[in-house]
């Protein structure tokens, strides 16, 4: 155990020169799998940004003749029930889906990690009050929370992100709290406190690196679900309105045709899968890079 | 420990009150008209207005809130569903039998399939087992539940005819496909969390020390590594159980299972206030109890956490 | 862990025991139902789902049998004066528990239903007076054309004795006069009915809705449309009216299956918000710019027909000549000319509000694409059912939409479809749903409602068409797909399957 404590100090010393962030990035860059994940993500984001200019067809152009057209050279991914080109819709849909998915994941994670560290570090009354409030919030069905947000705050991109992220916060807090509880009383933390490290510093450079792993795993796996969820928000005044494509909505539109025209579901499904895959590759790398036990 | 549990149980009272007030307020500000779903699409605006008046929906917020709290906490009456005309509590319990079976079976699958998969992956880090396990896990979290469910139905019910397509009238057979479809994501996430936290622990110095001491792989794994990797796993299981007892709408819809999820979603969509408010309260109670259970299990798994519960002052 | 396992095992065993072995006796039929009826008590509102089981569960005083109105429980209807009618019952009606049905039960049912307030049409019943054992006298406050029939058809009838014997107001176990009795109701899942061997009516006098050609009927609630198709393919259900249009070809002309197509009584129509589109030319331009053929192709897989007014053409008060009239057929030239006349230029934006459903989304998207051809933007505002209901009728929300996609139908008269949105007396703010306060429109609809003579009907129709406050798009068609166990599918006037009247 004492070895770990020394290891932590070592990190602390180096961070003075390089900064902890830089160090993590340095290790992350050396992780091939993570870099592949990151590159694909960047490609997807670039496609999303450029989509208005590079889609093969207009994403909203309907055509009676092309209804449910199967994949072909004209339409690589086929066409949907309104004869719209699925490839173009996926490319354009990346804008809303990636933006909403990533942003709400980030918001949920940041808020969740902040609350989780507070709760885990201070324990006692803080823990009890915050966790009971989370109990209350988690008891409310997500759909109702979203409707309430839409009704009280109105529509708009910010509120959509709020509606999508609010459901992910309690899980993040709980995971982090659980991990922090196990490291909270370890010797190296107490040692850090004894040498008068600031609380912020104890949390950010000693507690979090040792307890964040479950959060990274859960966050990177949750993004697929978040993208799917966005589809249900468009009925309650939030989210993206048709015909602007969005992967979750494309999937749910194709749902009733799934046995008849499976390509309506398969391609947006694959797109979501690709994002989940990349984020997981990246997340695994990040976790390893942040793990103080895994030094080169 | 007993004191801690007692204190937490006492905390349930403000939590329940909080849930009641919050859900009531949310239903109050949510637009949507219970009268219109009761009277159907052919009712005119004048007729709807009369029905709303009769239902007491035009009273001021504070009057309705007071009435609701009095009903719930003094008379212990959750009210009667607008749509079903039967008691909310009875309705919820009737639905709960199906949800409970699904939740228990799914959690069993998740724990007994997901955990070993995760351990296998961690101990063979970057090996074949790891790759297969992680691929399955990624499939699990990225395949939408409805897609998996419909594919299973197509294969096992429509083409092979082994199992019913939907419904609950065929005993256990009715629950096989829903449970598989529903637990796939859970197994995946369980496997991944287990792998991740096992990896974390395996890299720890004391495991290295234990191995160096010449202890057998198995002993190290199950006596030293697993218990220390359990905390995130318990969190996931606890959270998953709490969520699943709230019902899984997608699976219940696809398989036409009259579970809690469909009951609540229908109620939300038709603004069946008594069902939504009563259901949220009961599910919230169950959820809080499970979270308490999770905290208690933490203490059993890790004595350090127990010490924290029992008062930090003595320790500091 | 052992305890946990044994708990699971115990649960599993309890469940498998509870699953009943279906006793194969006589003919039985399983009907797939998309909506959940919920409370099946007699005096509930007409929510979706309920309508599917209504005629199997209950009998009314009167029903619509084909195109004619016939007494079901009622033997004779006598007019006393304009607002007073005597209803004579058959004198041998008994319910499933053996209670005799008399005039006092009629009084009880109408009074209870009116007090419950779920059947708003009954508000025009002033009182019911018991004249003798089998004659009840109805006093009405007002009667427009067709009102008498719809009132007598509206209220399900049960005996007071049976109703009061029920612990939950018959929410789960109704005892009725119908030939089928509920024997098992698994809420949210299945409702099973057994034929009542002692059904009161003589065969030759039995109306279609009360026929009983099969021994056992099970309604199975299957909310997912793909699963409805799967259940029929696996022959777990015998018939369903909720098979999505694009899957119909899987059953048409396929061995072991058959499809019956019947017109649905609902019609999709557009309502223009007068506050934001006060110019008739502008409204007409939009109507001409939308191609209904596209809508039928995209939203209904080619199965549906052009509406000729706000409502379909199957109602008795529909005027035949409208079928041959030009009614906002797609016309590019006219649309362009009218847009120009109204001063609408490219870049203009309309907000289209609709109730979210697959077909509505597609209709809305088609309209959006059609107007897009003129450089006009359409913002789609979909709402779920509860929210749409609120926005549709809420005066304060009317500033948030320009065009509304709505649908409506009636069990008897076209005027009742018009009334839903076009009679300002039925709105809380004294205008139509489209915020039109047009005295001429109001006087014409009142005339048509009071007396639905072809002249009155035509006058209103022509004025509405000319002003284009609202216009009909598509009348839907119901697809009844069934296994060959059912040799002839039968439906009620509301387009719902009548399992007892199907032939086997």
Per-range role (PLM):
Chain C
Residues 34-52, 73, 99, 147-156, ...:
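A structural "hinge/loop" feature
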């Amino acid at each position: 155990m004492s070895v770990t404590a020394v290891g932590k100090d070592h990190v602390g010393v180096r961070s003075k020169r390089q900064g902890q962030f830089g160090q993590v990035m340095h290790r992350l860059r050396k992780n091939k799998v993570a870099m592949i994940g990151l590159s694909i993500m960047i490609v997807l984001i670039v496609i999303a940004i450029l989509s208005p200019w590079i889609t093969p067809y207009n994403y909203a152009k309907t055509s009676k003749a092309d209804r449910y057209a199967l994949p072909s050279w004209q339409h690589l991914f086929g066409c949907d029930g309104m004869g719209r080109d699925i490839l173009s819709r996926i490319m354009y849909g990346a804008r809303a889906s990636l933006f909403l998915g990533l942003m709400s994941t980030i918001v949920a994670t940041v808020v969740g990690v902040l609350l989780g560290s507070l709760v885990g570090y201070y324990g006692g009354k803080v823990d009890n009050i915050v966790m009971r409030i989370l109990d209350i919030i988690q008891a409310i069905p997500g759909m109702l929370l979203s409707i309430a947000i839409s009704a009280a705050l109105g529509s708009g991109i910010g509120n959509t992100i709020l509606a999508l992220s609010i459901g992910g916060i309690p899980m993040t807090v709980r995971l982090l709290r659980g991990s922090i509880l196990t490291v909270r009383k370890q010797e190296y933390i107490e040692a850090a406190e004894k040498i008068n490290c600031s609380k912020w510093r104890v949390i950010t450079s000693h507690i979090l690196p040792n307890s964040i792993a479950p959060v990274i795993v859960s966050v990177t796996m949750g993004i697929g679900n978040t993208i799917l969820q966005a589809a249900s928000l468009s009925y309650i005044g939030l989210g993206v309105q048709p015909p602007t494509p969005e992967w979750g909505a494309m999937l749910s539109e194709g749902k009733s045709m799934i046995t008849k025209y499976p390509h309506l579901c398969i391609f947006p499904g694959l797109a979501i899968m690709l994002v989940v895959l990349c984020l997981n590759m990246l997340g695994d790398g990040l976790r390893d890079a942040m793990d103080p036990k895994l030094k080169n | 420990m007993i004191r801690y549990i007692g204190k937490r149980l006492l905390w349930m009272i403000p939590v329940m009150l909080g849930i009641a007030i919050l859900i009531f307020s949310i239903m109050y500000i949510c637009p949507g008209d219970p009268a219109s779903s009761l009277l159907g699409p052919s009712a005119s605006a004048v007729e709807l207005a009369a029905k709303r008046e009769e239902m007491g929906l035009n009273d001021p917020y504070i009057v309705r809130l007071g009435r609701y709290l009095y009903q719930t906490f003094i008379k212990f009456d959750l009210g009667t569903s607008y749509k079903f005309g039967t008691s909310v509590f009875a309705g919820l319990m009737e639905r709960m039998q199906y949800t409970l079976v699904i939740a228990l079976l799914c959690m069993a699958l998740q724990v007994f399939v997901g955990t070993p998969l995760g351990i296998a992956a961690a101990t063979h880090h970057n090996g074949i087992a790891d790759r297969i396990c992680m691929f399955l896990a990624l499939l699990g979290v990225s395949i939408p539940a409805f897609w998996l469910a419909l594919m299973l139905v197509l294969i096992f019910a429509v083409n092979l005819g082994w199992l019913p397509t939907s419904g609950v009238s065929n005993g256990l057979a009715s629950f096989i496909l829903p449970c598989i479809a529903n637990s796939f994501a859970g197994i995946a996430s369980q496997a991944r969390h287990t792998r991740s936290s096992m990896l974390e622990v395996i890299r720890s110095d004391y495991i290295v020390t234990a191995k160096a001491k010449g202890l057998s792989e198995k002993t190290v794994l199950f006596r030293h590594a697993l218990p220390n990797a359990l905390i995130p796993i318990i969190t996931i299981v606890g959270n998953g159980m709490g969520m699943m007892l709230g019902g899984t709408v997608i699976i219940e819809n696809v398989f036409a299972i009259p579970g809690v999820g469909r009951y609540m979603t229908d109620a939300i969509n038709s603004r069946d206030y008594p069902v939504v408010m009563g259901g949220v309260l009961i599910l919230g109670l169950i959820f809080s109890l499970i979270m308490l259970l999770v905290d208690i299990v933490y203490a059993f798994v890790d004595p350090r956490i127990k010490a924290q519960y029992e008062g930090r002052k003595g320790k500091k | 862990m052992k305890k946990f396992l044994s708990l699971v095992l115990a649960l599993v065993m309890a469940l498998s025991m509870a699953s009943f072995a279906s006793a194969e006796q006589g003919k039985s039929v399983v009907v797939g139902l998309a909506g959940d009826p919920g409370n099946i008590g007699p005096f509930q509102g007409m929510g979706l789902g309920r309508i599917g089981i209504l005629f199997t569960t209950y009998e009314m005083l009167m029903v619509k049998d084909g195109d004619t109105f016939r007494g079901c429980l009622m033997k004779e209807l006598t007019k006393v004066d304009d607002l007073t009618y005597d209803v004579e019952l058959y004198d041998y009606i008994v319910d499933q528990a053996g209670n005799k049905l008399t005039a006092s039960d009629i009084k009880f049912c109408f009074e209870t239903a009116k007090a419950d307030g779920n059947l708003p049409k009954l508000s025009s019943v002033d009182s019911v007076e018991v004249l003798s054992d089998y004659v009840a006298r109805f006093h009405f406050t007002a009667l427009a054309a067709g009102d008498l029939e719809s009132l007598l058809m509206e209220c399900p009838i049960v005996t007071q004795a049976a109703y009061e014997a029920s612990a939950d107001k018959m929410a789960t176990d109704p005892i009725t006069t119908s030939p089928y009795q509920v024997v098992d109701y698994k809420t949210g899942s299945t409702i099973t009915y057994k034929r009542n061997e002692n059904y009161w009516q003589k065969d030759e006098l039995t109306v279609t809705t009360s026929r009983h050609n099969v021994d056992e009927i099970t309604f199975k609630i299957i909310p997912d449309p793909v699963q409805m198709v799967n259940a029929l393919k696996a022959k777990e259900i015998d018939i369903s009216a909720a098979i999505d249009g694009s899957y119909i070809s899987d059953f048409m002309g396929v061995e072991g299956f058959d499809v019956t197509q019947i017109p649905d009584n609902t019609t999709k129509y557009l309502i223009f918000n007068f506050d934001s589109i006060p110019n008739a030319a502008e409204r007409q331009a939009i109507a001409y710019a939308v191609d209904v053929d596209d809508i039928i192709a995209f939203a209904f897989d080619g199965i549906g027909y052009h509406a000729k007014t706000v409502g379909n053409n199957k109602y008795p008060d529909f005027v035949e000549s409208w079928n041959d009239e030009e009614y906002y057929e797609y016309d590019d030239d006219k649309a362009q000319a009218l847009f120009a006349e109204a001063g609408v230029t490219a870049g203009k934006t309309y907000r289209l509000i609709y109730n979210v459903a697959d077909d509505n989304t597609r209709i809305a998207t088609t309209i959006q694409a059609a107007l897009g051809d003129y450089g006009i933007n359409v913002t789609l505002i979909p709402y779920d059912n509860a929210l749409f209901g609120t926005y549709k009728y809420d005066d304060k929300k009317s500033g948030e939409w320009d065009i509304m996609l709505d649908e409506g139908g009636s069990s008897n008269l076209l005027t009742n479809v018009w009334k839903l949105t076009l009679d300002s007396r039925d709105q809380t703010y004294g205008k139509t749903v489209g915020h039109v306060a047009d005295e001429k429109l109001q006087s014409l609809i009142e005339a048509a409602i009071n007396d639905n003579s072809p002249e009155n009907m035509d006058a209103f129709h022509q004025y509405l068409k000319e002003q284009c406050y609202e216009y009909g798009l598509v009348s839907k068609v119901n697809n009844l797909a069934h296994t060959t166990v059912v040799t002839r599918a039968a439906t009620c006037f509301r387009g719902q399957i009548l399992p007892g009247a199907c032939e086997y």
